[in-house]
Amino acid sequence: MNKTHFNHISVLKQEAIDFLKIKPEGIYVDATLGQCGHTIEIANLLQQGFLYSFDQDVEACTNAKKILPPHLPIEIIHSNFSHLKTQLAQRNVFQLDGILFDLGLSSCQIDNPQRGFSYLHNTPLDMRMNVNQTITAQYILNNYSFAQLKNIFKVYGEVKNAALVASEIIKQRPLCTSYDLVAITDRFCNRQKGHSAKKIFQALRIEVNQELESLKQALEQSLDLLKPNAMIVVISFHSLEDRIVKHFFKKNSTFVLPKKMPITIMPQTPLSIITKKAFLPSEEEMQNNSRSISAKLRVAVKNG
C-alpha cells in the first residue's frame, strides 16, 4: 500500500502506534479523528484490515474526507465516541483488534476563533465540538444557577475561587464574548500557571461537550468490543481525564476477593495494564510540540 503523510503533528504518535501492535488484517478504531494524524499512521499499516475513525466535529470529518486518499481502508464516522457500540453494530462490527483515544482539542478547533474555544480572541462563547447540539458556553454562563456554575468551575476546572467567579458572572450577565468572561477571570483567577481564563474555559468546554461522561461511556464500551490480546491506548491532556482512565484500568485489572471466601485460584480480570506509570513525551517532543507538555499515555491489553 502506498503511504500517505500529513504535516499535522500528533502527540506521542509513534509511541501510540507501537503500543497498538497493528496487525495488517486487524480491525481498529481511532476514536478521535481530529486532523488525521494517528488515523493515517494506522491506515498505512493495514492491508486486509480496516479502520473506523470517529469524530463528533463535522468540520473535522469534512476536512478528512477532502484530504484522505480514497484507497485507504478507512470509514469516517461523524459521531461522539460514546456511541461506539451502536455505530459499529450498524456496520456489523462487534470485535476490535485495538482502539486509540487521543483526547482533548484538535488544532483546527483551537486555531479557529469562531469556534469559541480560545480566550485569546474576542469571539462568541460557543465551545461546541458538535455544532448540531444546542447548549453553548454562552447559554451555560447566562442560564445556569450560581450553584451549578460554582460546581462546574470547582470540579471541571479545579478553580480555587469558583464561588467568586460564579457570583461575578451572575452579576455581569449577559456575557456574550470570550473577552466578557476574561474580564472576570483576570480579576478573580490566579495567573501563576498560565492565562487566568485557562481553567475556566476548560471547565466550560467539558460541561458543554459532556467530555468526561462521554469518556467513561466509551471506555466501558471498548471493554466489550476488544478481542482477547487487543490493545486500548489512551492519550489524555489534563488530570481529570487521566484520573478516569487510570481508575478504569485499575478497576478492570484487579479482583478483590470477599473476606474469608475460600477461593485459591484468582479469576482472570478483563484487562492487564501495560503502562504501570503513565508514559510521557520526551524532552525533544515537548520542545518541538508545546501541546504535548501535559500529555499522558496509558495502555492496557484485553485478557482472553
Curated annotation (Swiss-Prot):
Localisation per UniProt entry: Cytoplasm
Spans traversing the lipid bilayer: none
GO biological process: rRNA base methylation
Top-level EC class: transferase
Gene3D superfamilies: Putative methyltransferase TM0872, insert domain, Vaccinia Virus protein VP39
GO molecular function: rRNA (cytosine-N4-)-methyltransferase activity
Assigned GO CC terms: cytoplasm
Reaction(s) catalysed by this chain's protein: cytidine(1402) in 16S rRNA + S-adenosyl-L-methionine = N(4)-methylcytidine(1402) in 16S rRNA + S-adenosyl-L-homocysteine + H(+)
EC number(s) on file: 2.1.1.199
Binding site for S-adenosyl-L-methionine: 36-38, 55, 81, 102, 109
A Pfam entry, by short name: Methyltransf_5
Recorded coiled-coil stretches: none
Keywords linked to the UniProt accession: Cytoplasm, Methyltransferase, rRNA processing, S-adenosyl-L-methionine, Transferase
NCBIfam families membership: 16S rRNA (cytosine(1402)-N(4))-methyltransferase RsmH
Role summary: Specifically methylates the N4 position of cytidine in position 1402 (C1402) of 16S rRNA.
Family from the record: Belongs to the methyltransferase superfamily. RsmH family.
Name the UniProt record assigns to this protein: Ribosomal RNA small subunit methyltransferase H
Source organism of this protein record: Onion yellows phytoplasma (strain OY-M)
